[in-house]
């Protein structure tokens, strides 16, 4: 379990890996039982004891799932604000997989080979005929401002005119800006 004290210890550390693994290719995405709620798996259940895992052999219920189900109501009333926020994040990312043509059907273009300065961020482009997504995952524990290099080859390969003003939408927050898609961009990351 990602949130287990035996592993990452914090479910928020799974946000950047989710973004990368869900949006990188057209593959299906599997979310482990309760991961979207920050399930820690730290109960001392069954034969395994407290080991940061959830037993699959014993009659056991996972606390976050039990509270989410709320006796079949699925009304989220028993979830904490942190759990609701994380669940919302997972829903947004997974909905992008379905709603974005670039993710659903498009091509992957890695940008890391021209961005060796990035130590805790990972960036790539997903492109289809109708849509281009610039994906930036911030693995750092704090907000940061970075410069992203985009090779001229990307513009040539996809037939995109460099320095053309584009309307950019942050698909997680909904905020929009208009700026040029250029070979040297400086976005601020949360």
Residue ranges and their predicted role:
Residues 167-175:
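GAF sensory/regulatory domain recognition
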